[in-house]
Amino acid sequence: MINLIFFNIFLLYKMVEKVLATYFEDKIGMRDNDLYDGGMYYAELSNDPKKKDFKALGGLKNGHKLKITYNGVSVIASKGDVGAGGPKHPKIDLHINLAKALGFTNGLDYVTIEDA
C-alpha cells in the first residue's frame, strides 16, 4: 500500500527549475532535423563544456517536451539539439524562434522549465 501511494505521488511530481539560458540560430539539429520547420526547439547543454556530456538537464531524450517560461510568457518546446555550453555554464539553449516567441532578447538570462 505504501509503495502504491509513493508511486502515485511520484507520478504527480513535476520538475520545475530555474536555469540559466542562452539562444542559438543553428539550422540543423543533432539528428539532422530541420530546426526551422515551424516547431519550437531547445538544446540541452553539457555540465562541463569541455566534456560535452549533454546532460545539464539530466540527459533528456530527443523530443522531450518542456514548458519554458520567461517574464511570464510560456511556450511548450521540444528537445531538438544538444550543445557544449559556455563559460557561464547555461543549462539550456533556446532556438532563435523559441527565444523570439518568449521575448528572450538577452544573450544570457534565467528561464523556468518544467515537464510539459
Give the ranges of each region predicted by the language model.
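Secreted/periplasmic proteins
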Residues: 8, 13-116
